[in-house]
């Protein structure tokens, strides 16, 4: 069989990594080995942090709901308990948005929660 030098395939694979490493500092954007390590690390962090972002936003929503419910005389846990008892099915994302953008509407929801406790 004829000898295959793999020039095209290897260059394409290296260019793919170097394209992902574009904008990195120093050798990390120029040298294939350094770029490979940097890209691998960056992709691992991106994968991990897409999951961490969900946790962070949920805790932010809970903090905002807690602050708004305390302004209405309820703790967060009592507020959520009251909503569950009243069969109010508004998720934390929407509750946090209402707490920030419409405090009067949130106080009405808090009244519903307080009445059902």
From Swiss-Prot:
**What does the UniProt keyword field contain?**
Ribonucleoprotein, Ribosomal protein, RNA-binding, rRNA-binding
One molecular function GO term is: rRNA binding
Q: Which InterPro entries match?
A: Ribosomal_bL20 (IPR005813), RIBOSOMAL_L20_CS (IPR049946), Ribosomal_protein_bL20_C (IPR035566)
Q: Pfam families, from UniProt?
A: Ribosomal_L20 (PF00453)
Q: Which GO terms describe its cellular component?
A: ribonucleoprotein complex; ribosome
A biological process from GO: ribosomal large subunit assembly
Per the record, the domain of life is Bacteria
Function according to Swiss-Prot or TrEMBL: Binds directly to 23S ribosomal RNA and is necessary for the in vitro assembly process of the 50S ribosomal subunit. It is not involved in the protein synthesizing functions of that subunit.
**What protein family is recorded?**
Belongs to the bacterial ribosomal protein bL20 family.
**Could you identify this protein by its name?**
Large ribosomal subunit protein bL20
Q: Which organism is it from?
A: Pelobacter propionicus (strain DSM 2379 / NBRC 103807 / OttBd1)
Lineage here is: Bacteria, Pseudomonadati, Thermodesulfobacteriota, Desulfuromonadia, Desulfuromonadales
The gene that this protein is the product of is rplT
